């Protein structure tokens, strides 16, 4: 993690919003555990619709600037209210993204939440294995080099088994094992 990310985490870690079902995940959370790369953003997931009416004013009171997500238009076309599913902010040059787990495999994974707290604060960080599984899902669903790098670190550190990876792949691709 960069010093900027650490400073922003220190600013947000005890906010009241983290009393809700919000969990620190993503490459920075993975890096927190295994120190495999420098990460410059903060991802927060919720298994539920985001409580945007709470999150937005609290983040703005800290000086965070809300930015639009590139999927906003698509969400509106689908009849959804974007702020319930994704919120992005910039605070001290660090991107903070809150998102609702909307894929069935993500929702299923988040039903068995195991977490610890970040630096003994209100900010909950998913356990390493759950973070790794969410990163494997991201790896299979988008084309970002950092996901490939994280996937390699997950394999190298034996965080999830080959069977877990195969199962995730099957669920995402809707492949039968028969």
Where do the model's predicted regions map?
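Compositionally biased terminal segments of proteins
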Residues: 1-178
